[in-house]
């Protein structure tokens, strides 16, 4: 019997902050399970979830607006600790009898708050001391409104010159509010405050660890599928790879992985996937060479969104054909992770805007009646990687830079041709190899090469050549929602350019993309 790793759990109500998923990841890092729900949940849903504590996230709205989001009143009647962050503090103050109004000055960025009263939330936590010995905390503010009167049964714990109620608390009810973001690294003691709330005030044990998550997932898979056969589309990406390893541990030879080589992969990637999972780990793998089929379907298509849809459609067709060849397969496994679940829920409630369509196994043939196995659906990406390491997957594979589902199909601009893909593969491999050699690969968040469908004149020896252009792209980011272009050394860029032009016959010019996100996206298509 495996331990119940969901026994102690935190509920996070999302009011729309860009940092809300980060709050959840921080709670998980503390070894405690949590879930992220939209703010408008019902009392019955909260009761059913039975949280050990509740966190109210930040958000972009103003509590002074009539129809702005509010926490369900039951949150304050459930008898569990509540922690309001930024907007979460404001709605807590307002709903419990305090007052909020728009501030004359919007506070955004670094601030230092002075602790003026003792509280379980910050006791013994400090970054510095005032001249008269009061603790100071370095925090990250991001708010326009501010609490101007706290509820009558609360006390002021900390303040700044422009924000009189930076932390408020009702110790008896274990309600706490902070007007800053403890989840971001700029709030230097933020993790200690979250740990104090989750582990000490809510009394949650650290049961959510990679080894225990694996044991739990294996037990759940076995309980769900029994002796049935399962099929998985293996791409070699982090999510499908960790899904494959978990299923292999749980059901062994009852798992069949279908690896579709679409001709849009990185250099030698197909061989590496087959060697690792087939030869090294001993998984059942069906290898489907399908380059011609994908490239035929893409012929003549220039529109990025149409290309994504074609690649997704052909993948499903090929995968379905292979699935139908297998006997007695009852289950389809997918590498869905928790942010996918959150995004789907947001889309269903009309709270998300699709910028690019996501690429996944989009459907099953109607004649196939299969159940769905999603062993990673409770996990964030960083947790998936930690589990992969625990399962024996190599670090370099798990911490590789992100690669889009449609692969080179969206890194070749315009029409996708085999010639373009082959040139791009080799140029990209040189860029990545040089990044690793210069110890720069792990210093950038994502790096890749883009094929531009334009010819440029060049000189090679005594002759002129009229060949293709590629662009190098490297960015630095924490969350991929915003990104800065990486300031790579000029001599490094020169070395990469020389190698590509000299070693890849067909490329005459290399450029470097210096666009940030926004306004540009990280990928070109």
Swiss-Prot record:
Binding positions (ATP): 235-241
Disulfide bonds: none
CDD domains in the cross-refs: GATase1_GMP_Synthase (cd01742), GMP_synthase_C (cd01997)
Highest taxon above the source species: Bacteria
Ranges where the Glutamine amidotransferase type-1 domain occurs: 9-207
Active-site residue list: 86, 181, 183
UniProt cross-references to SUPFAM superfamilies, sorted A to Z: Adenine nucleotide alpha hydrolases-like, Class I glutamine amidotransferase-like, GMP synthetase C-terminal dimerisation domain
A cellular component term, taken from the record's GO annotations: cytosol
Pathway assigned to this chain's UniProt record: Purine metabolism; GMP biosynthesis; GMP from XMP (L-Gln route): step 1/1
Sorted UniProt keywords: ATP-binding, Glutamine amidotransferase, GMP biosynthesis, Ligase, Nucleotide-binding, Purine biosynthesis
InterPro entries: Class_I_gatase-like (IPR029062), GATASE (IPR017926), GMP_synth_C (IPR001674), GMP_synth_GATase (IPR004739), GMP_synthase (IPR022955), GMPS_ATP_PPase_dom (IPR025777), NAD/GMP_synthase (IPR022310), Rossmann-like_a/b/a_fold (IPR014729)
Pfam families, alphabetized: GATase, GMP_synt_C, NAD_synthase
The GMPS ATP-PPase domain, residue ranges: 208-400
Catalytic activity: XMP + L-glutamine + ATP + H2O = GMP + L-glutamate + AMP + diphosphate + 2 H(+)
EC number: 6.3.5.2
Single GO MF descriptor: ATP binding
Subunit structure, interactors included: Homodimer.
Biological function: Catalyzes the synthesis of GMP from XMP.
The protein's name in its UniProt record: GMP synthase [glutamine-hydrolyzing]
Species per Swiss-Prot/TrEMBL record: Escherichia coli O1:K1 / APEC
């Amino acid at each position: 019997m495996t331990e119940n790793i969901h026994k102690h759990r935190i509920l996070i109500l999302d009011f729309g902050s860009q940092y809300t998923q980060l709050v959840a990841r921080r709670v998980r890092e503390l070894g405690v399970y949590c879930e992220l729900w939209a703010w408008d949940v019902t009392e019955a849903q909260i009761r059913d979830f039975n949280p050990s504590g509740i966190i109210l996230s930040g958000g972009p709205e103003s509590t002074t607006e009539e129809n702005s989001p509010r926490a369900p009143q039951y949150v304050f009647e459930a008898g569990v600790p509540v922690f309001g962050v930024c907007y979460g503090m404001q709605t807590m103050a307002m709903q419990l009898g305090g007052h909020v109004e728009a501030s004359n000055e919007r506070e955004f960025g670094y601030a230092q708050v002075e602790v003026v009263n003792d509280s379980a939330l910050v006791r013994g936590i400090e970054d510095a001391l005032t001249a008269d010995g009061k603790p100071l905390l370095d925090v990250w503010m991001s708010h326009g409104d501010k609490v101007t009167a706290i509820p009558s049964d609360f006390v002021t714990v900390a303040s700044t010159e422009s924000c009189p109620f930076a932390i408020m608390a009702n110790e008896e009810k274990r309600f706490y509010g902070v007007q800053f973001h403890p989840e971001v690294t700029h709030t230097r003691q933020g993790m200690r405050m979250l740990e104090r709330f989750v582990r000490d005030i809510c009394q949650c044990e650290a049961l959510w660890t990679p080894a225990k998550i694996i044991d739990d997932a294996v037990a759940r898979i076995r309980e769900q599928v029994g002796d049935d056969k399962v099929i998985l589309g293996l791409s070699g990406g982090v999510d499908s790879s960790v899904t494959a390893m978990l299923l292999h541990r749980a059901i062994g030879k009852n798992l069949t992985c279908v690896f579709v080589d679409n001709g849009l992969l990185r250099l030698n990637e197909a061989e590496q996937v087959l060697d690792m999972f087939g030869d090294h780990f001993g998984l059942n793998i069906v290898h489907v060479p399908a380059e011609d089929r994908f490239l035929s379907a893409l012929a003549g298509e220039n529109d990025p969104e149409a290309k994504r849809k074609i690649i997704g459609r052909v993948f499903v067709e090929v995968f379905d054909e292979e699935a139908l060849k297998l006997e007695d397969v009852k289950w389809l496994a997918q590498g869905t992770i928790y942010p996918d679940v959150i995004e789907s829920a947001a889309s269903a409630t009309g709270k998300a805007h699709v910028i690019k369509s996501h690429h996944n196994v989009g459907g099953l043939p109607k004649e196939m009646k299969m159940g769905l196995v999603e062993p990673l659906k409770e996990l964030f990406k960083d947790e998936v990687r930690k589990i992969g390491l625990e399962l024996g997957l190599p670090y370099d594979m798990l911490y590789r830079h992100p690669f889009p589902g449609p692969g080179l199909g969206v890194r070749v601009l315009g029409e996708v041709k085999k010639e373009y893909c082959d040139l791009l593969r080799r140029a990209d491999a040189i860029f990545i190899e040089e990044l690793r050699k210069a110890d720069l690969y792990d210093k950038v968040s994502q790096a890749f090469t883009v094929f531009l469908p334009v010819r440029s004149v060049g000189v090679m020896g005594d002759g002129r050549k009229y060949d293709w252009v590629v662009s190098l792209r490297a960015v630095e980011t924490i969350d991929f929602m915003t990104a800065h272009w990486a300031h790579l050394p000029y001599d490094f860029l020169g070395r990469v350019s020389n190698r590509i032009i000299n070693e890849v016959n067909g490329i005459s010019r290399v450029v470097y993309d210096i666009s940030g996100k926004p306004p540009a996206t990280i990928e070109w298509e």
